[in-house]
Structure formats: structure tokens, C-alpha cells
Amino acid sequence: MMSWAAARLTETAARCFRARCLGFRVGPWCVSQHENSSYGAAPHRTLRVSAVAFAGHNKWSKVRHIKGPKDMERSRIFSKLTLSIRLAVKEGGPNPENNSSLANILEVCRSKNMPKSTIESALKSEKNKGIYLLYEGRGPGGSSLLIEALSNSGPKCHLEIKYILNKNGGMMTEGARHFFDKKGVVVVGVEDREKKAVNLERALELAIEAGAEDVREAEDEEEEKNLFKFICDASSLHQVRKKLDSLGLCSVSCSLEFIPHSKVQLSEPELEQAVHLIQALSNHEDVIHVYDNIE
């Protein structure tokens, strides 16, 4: 049976969802917990509701995912997945039965139809001895960037990332990490196992039941499919995914990601410059992922 607190969250989240459908502006979260309540009410978990449209309808999402020829795009995705496999093997070994991070990545690889030979090559690669690097950067308009990389030469990678940043209106800086939280992210489709559509209101109810903190609408860059991202505490990632699966949702992947807790808005020229910068960083052979806090 749903608790009073959970029911209260569900009702409030639903009101926020209906308000957005009617065109009202909703803040970055709809439900919050008062830290110093004097009414003696039972404490309840905070559930944030991201007030954003699906990625395909968001200005930043439209410009940041400009894709080249399909073959080149698939090659880029496979290259980044190879880096992710190498990092997972480096941190937890080559056996997916004992390495949940690797198991999750291999699941994504199969969903992207990555060739088996490419996966096996990445698993056995001697380059798995590379160094994990996390660079902090400043982008156009005061935006913050985190650049994850895996390299066999830390100094060389550092110089090249610094050069790309400087060339495209950015710079290396300290402090960008403070704008992000490392969270668990479970990605699910917008249809359940019975092929019934799941709307945001229903996703919010399931998030409460599964123990997630946030629900965000997203889009698969390659297949242009709408998705939901359930965000949770890093330590509860696998429990949340298991619960969402048990509730009938179709999970696509789960991973740990850097999620911005404050965002910045950029002008049109700044957005264009940010696109070029992030694309240049993403094209570096050692870069796994580039995180930003652009609205």
C-alpha cells in the first residue's frame, strides 16, 4: 500500500504535469521537502520533476546532436562504447557476471548492434591498462564542462584537451565539478512491456514506487526515440532498475552519470560555439563522454 507521503508526492506531481500540459510555467522541480517543518508531518522523499520537453523539442538538444553521415555516426558511437568497455574492464575485470558496469555496457552494445568481434576485441585489448581522466572545463557563456577520458598517455591527452578547449572558446579550469552530482541513471522506453504508452504522469508515479529522485524526458540520439531517464542515488542504481523492470517498464540501460544541478542559458552565438566545442571534444579518440550544464 502506498504511504501517505508517497500519495502526496503523486498528487502534487500529477498537478504539475497537468499544469504543464495547459501551458503554465513550472519550475525546475515541483515537489520538495521542507527542511524545518513545524507541522509534525511525516517526512517524505524529494521527487524532482524536470520541466523540459522531449529532447527533440529543446533548442540545445536540437543543435548539440547534429549528426554526420549515418556510417560515421555509428562508427563514433562504437568508438565511445569501446572506450566504455575498456574502462569497465579496467575497474572491475572482464567477466560481466562479476562486473555489473561491464554487463550494462555490453547490453547497450548489443542494443546498438555493435559487431561481436568489436566487443570481443575491446574486452581483450591490452589498452585496458589506460588511465581514467576527468577534466574540468569552462565553455561559452560561463557553462561548465566535465570531460571523461581513458588514455594511455595522460600528459598528451591533457595537452590535446586543453588545446581543443582554448581553440573553441573554452578553457581548463577548476571548480566545474561542483556544478554536477554523480547519480545513477536508468533509461527506459516510453512503452511498457505490454506495448502501452507511458506518459510523464505515470512515469512519476513509478519513480516514487521505485525510489527514484527525478524523472527526465530524453531522446535516443541515433534512433530518435523518446525515452525516460529515472535518476537516483548512485548507491541504489541497480535496485531502482530492478524495481522499474518489475513494474512493467522496459529498461534500456543503467549507468552512473554526472548530472548538473544548476544550468545556464546561452545566447544563439554562444550555443553555436558550444556545439562546435563539444563536438570537437567528443571527436577526440580518448574522450568517453562530455557533460555540460547548458539549459
From Swiss-Prot:
One of its GO terms (molecular function) is rRNA binding. Keywords: Acetylation, Activator, Coiled coil, Mitochondrion, Translation regulation. GO terms for biological process: mitochondrial cytochrome c oxidase assembly; motor learning; regulation of mitochondrial translation. Residues 190-225 form a coiled coil. It is found in: Mitochondrion. It holds the Pfam family Transcrip_reg. The modification N6-acetyllysine is found at residue 162. It comes from the Eukaryota. The keyword Coiled coil applies. GO terms for cellular component: mitochondrion. Belongs to the TACO1 family. PANTHER family: TRANSLATIONAL ACTIVATOR OF CYTOCHROME C OXIDASE 1. Acts as a translational activator of mitochondrially-encoded cytochrome c oxidase 1. This is Translational activator of cytochrome c oxidase 1. It comes from Rattus norvegicus.
